[in-house]
């Protein structure tokens, strides 16, 4: 049967500020169709997959945490993923709760490594049922977390990130809360509460958060994902994109397998490359300091601007941002070097080239290798509108 869109009203308006108060939380913020499951069997007994055109679906998500292991200590069979970007990215290794939504209710189940994830594994009755299609937002991440504890997903799978990028490639954000906000019945207040609690208490490990807050946050994630799917999935037929979407899902599963297998690293070569690039970077940095006449933070636009002015560079040659800060990107430095014979500008470009190669392709790959000598990069399927794929965390060569 066709899915009828939810008539529940939105729980939060954009921009509303929420904070977690344990004394009033349940009274003010409880959601009657959100539950913490006491056992896997409770979910199995109560879940009735929602249907679209006779096809059965459920939505799932995982909440995860990092182990204390360094990347080169990660054992075979466990693939580390990362949350966030750049240097602020946090490693994630194992799930501590799994949430499932059937369009009417959402359940969150907790389990631990000490219990050998025996309760989670009982959910195989759902995850390994090929007649039930499984939906997630950033499916590969959650699939890795499940396989890290020897759980498998069988049957067709769906990713609302890929789905929503096909239905509208010009969205300003593909975060779940931002996509779901346009649909009646969305619930995003718990994410704001979680962020506020994280900032106030300086806690990054979600296992340390109040249980009721995590449960509602996790249940809201699968509920919002459900809303996005039932509203956006029909658009594939409307826009003539269903065949393309199905191809993208097959590709996603293949990319997941490639991530899982990993890329073997020549450790001897990487170690030699790391040493050579470190020497080139250090020499380039020393040459900059020698011409500047002092040591400064080469990566600081403000400090670099001051050095350029002290060396006699005309202030009018250095453009500003809209906020008035000096710009010292490669285009500005190339112009100073080629058109105005500013020799230190070329030295800075050389330093940046070697430093990027060092941190990205030598240190990044060498330091993130697993115990079996492989790197398990994240293959980005939807980052570029041109269709080009890339591999990050650690960065590897661009994929055609």
Where are the language model's segments positioned?
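Conserved "right-hand" nucleotidyltransferase catalytic core of DNA-directed polymerases
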Residues: 2-106, 171, 183-186, 195-400
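Acidic beta-strand-to-loop metal/phosphate-binding motif
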Residues: 59, 131-139
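Short, glycine/acidic-enriched loop or turn micro-motifs at the edges of active sites
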Residues: 64-66, 140, 162
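Nucleic-acid-processing active sites and adjacent nucleic-acid-binding tracks
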Residues: 102-134
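Amphipathic alpha-helical transducer elements in NTP-driven molecular machines
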Residues: 117-120, 173-177, 222
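Phosphate- and divalent-cation-binding pockets in alpha/beta enzyme and binding domains
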Residues: 141-148, 307
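Alpha-helical scaffold elements adjacent to nucleotide-binding pockets in ATP/GTP-utilizing enzyme cores
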Residues: 142-145, 175-179
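Conserved beta-strand -> loop -> alpha-helix junction used to position metal-binding or nucleic-acid-contacting
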Residues: 152-169, 176-178
